[in-house]
């Protein structure tokens, strides 16, 4: 069973192409606001595939590891751009699939380099962010490499708001991510 969480529609196509070549069931969690974005299409769109269980490093950095997926990945990238003006270098990792999850421990390798980690998720507290946290911190032993406490940023624990304005106040936003990471860098 696969649980796929693409960050955009090109990644979704790559995942669908991978699924067409397999015989296994899957759940595809598409980010709805991804339909409104313009993306550069690869020349090999029908052959393009995304490997499952292998996170992709979207941005290399040395100070902190940001782990996310789907729609919140763009928000994390905006926050990393803001933090760059303060000389904070963020490594951003897109998990791509929740099942299987990071089979080569790529997130752990990043944590060994940065010694700080934050998991960002648009789900409720205790959802996918907690799952990713458990996998990296407990199962892979990531706690051994921490200089500060690991953190999660999730949606607020209330009924989801409606519309883009509601998303800003209900789900993680770039300013919230920036503030938390600045705080972590001071510890």
Spans of model-derived segments:
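Thiamine diphosphate
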Residues: 32-187
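A generic secondary-structure signal marking the coil-to-beta-strand transition
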Residues: 24-25, 149
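Conserved thiamine diphosphate
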Residues: 1-22, 89, 160, 180-185
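Short, high-confidence coil segments that cap the C-terminus of an alpha-helix
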Residues: 23-24, 114
């Amino acid at each position: 069973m696969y649980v796929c969480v693409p960050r955009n529609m090109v990644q979704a196509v790559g995942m669908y192409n991978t699924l067409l070549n397999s015989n296994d069931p899957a759940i595809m969690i598409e980010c709805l606001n991804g339909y409104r974005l313009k993306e550069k299409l690869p020349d090999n769109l029908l052959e393009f595939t995304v490997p499952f269980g292998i996170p992709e490093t979207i941005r290399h950095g040395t100070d902190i590891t940001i782990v996310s997926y789907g729609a919140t990945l763009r928000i994390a990238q905006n926050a990393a751009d803001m933090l760059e003006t303060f000389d904070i270098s963020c490594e951003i990792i897109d998990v791509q699939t929740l099942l299987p999850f990071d089979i080569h421990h790529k997130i752990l390798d990043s944590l060994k380099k940065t010694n700080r980690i934050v998991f960002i998720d648009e789900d409720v507290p205790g959802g996918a962010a907690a799952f990713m946290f458990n996998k990296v911190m407990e199962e892979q032993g990531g706690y051994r490499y921490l200089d500060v406490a690991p953190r999660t940023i999730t949606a607020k624990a209330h009924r989801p708001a409606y519309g883009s304005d509601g998303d800003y106040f209900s789900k993680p936003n770039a300013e919230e991510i920036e503030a938390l990471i600045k705080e972590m860098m001071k510890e």
